[in-house]
Regions:
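Basic/aromatic-rich interaction segments and small domains that mediate binding to polyanionic partners
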Residues: 2-76
Length: 76
C-alpha cells in the first residue's frame, strides 16, 4: 500500500467529487468489475481510495496507486 500525501488526497477529492461518474480502467481484485464498467463516486477515503457505487451493484473502491479509473462526466 502506498502512502498518500495530504496534497495528493486533496487533489483526488477535488477531481473525484461525490456524484461524479467514472469508468473502470484497471482493478486487481478477484471480484473486480469488468473493465469499462461505469459508476458514481460516493467519496474518497483517508487513504485515497475512490469509493464507487458501480452500475452493476458492486461497491468496490478504486485503490490509490493500484487500480485505475477515469472521470467520464467531462466527456459530455
Amino acid at each position: 500500500m502506498r502512502i498518500i500525501s495530504k496534497e495528493r488526497l486533496h487533489h483526488l477529492r477535488e477531481k473525484y467529487p461525490v456524484g461524479c461518474r467514472v469508468e473502470l480502467l484497471r482493478m486487481d481484485d478477484i471480484q473486480a468489475a469488468v473493465i469499462g464498467t461505469k459508476g458514481t463516486v460516493i467519496g474518497v477515503d483517508v487513504i485515497g481510495s475512490i469509493m464507487v457505487s458501480w452500475d452493476t451493484g458492486s461497491s468496490l473502491s478504486v485503490v490509490f496507486g493500484e487500480d485505475l479509473c477515469r472521470r467520464i462526466d467531462d466527456d459530455k
